């Protein structure tokens, strides 16, 4: 049985503390990036090269929560001008790797760096040097890191719960890094309100973008 919430004020403060912990994870990642960006710049170089090459695309992959993050990021990248898709690593091993073409860049999402399906997919990609792989997760010193051309550090000190190690801070950080990359590529290509209005005509965002482009 769930424990009764006797004190809603305490519950609200618990949520506030969780938000602060998530924010701290992002700040710590930003601090690491400011102090040493060498590895990150290698990943940026590959992503920019892919985004600038006509016909090439950025392909996110993962399983579980990482796959859900990849789907969201692929949608964001595409909506702001960088062609992107997301494929499930398991489905990739059963035919979906056919979407990869020379010049693509795969962003493999695995916080542990040891997700079996992602490793198998990456190993298969490594047989074809015409597609590069950027990993994102806790440590480049991992089975996935050893297979990648570049690595994006998304390590966190802890998740929100000490007892249940569900992806929380780590998944939020992955998402935030991906959004930041999408905006970086958007700004490089001078993608503006008129471009966004063409890609996103529906809903409140579409109406606002259309008005801003006038």
Task: Describe the residue ranges of each PLM region.
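Aromatic-residue hotspot detector
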Residues: 40-44, 86, 196
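An N-terminal, well-structured beta->alpha segment
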Residues: 2-52, 56
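Short, basic/glycine-rich phosphate-binding loops at helix/coil junctions
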Residues: 18-25, 73, 77, 213
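Internal, active-site/partner-interface "lid" segment
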Residues: 146, 160, 187-214
């Amino acid at each position: 049985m769930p424990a009764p919430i006797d004190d809603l004020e305490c519950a609200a403060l618990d949520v506030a503390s969780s938000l602060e912990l998530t924010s701290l994870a992002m700040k710590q990642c930003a601090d690491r990036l400011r102090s040493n960006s060498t590895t990150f710049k290698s990943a940026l170089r590959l992503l920019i090269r892919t985004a600038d090459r006509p016909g090439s695309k950025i392909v996110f992959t993962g399983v579980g929560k990482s796959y859900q993050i990849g789907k969201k990021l692929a949608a964001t990248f595409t909506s702001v001008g960088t062609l992107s898709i997301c494929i499930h690593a398991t489905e990739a091993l059963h035919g979906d790797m056919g979407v990869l073409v020379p010049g693509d860049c795969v962003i493999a999402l695995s916080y542990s760096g040891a997700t079996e399906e992602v490793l198998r997919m990456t190993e298969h990609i490594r047989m074809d040097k015409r597609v590069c792989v950027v990993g994102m997760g806790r440590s480049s010193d991992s089975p996935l890191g050893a297979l990648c051309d570049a690595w994006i550090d998304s390590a966190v000190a802890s998740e929100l719960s000490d007892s249940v190690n569900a992806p929380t801070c780590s998944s939020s950080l992955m998402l935030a890094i991906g959004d930041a990359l999408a905006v970086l590529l958007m700004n490089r290509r001078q993608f503006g309100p008129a471009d966004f209005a063409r890609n996103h005509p529906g809903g409140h965002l579409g109406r606002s973008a259309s008005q801003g482009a006038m």
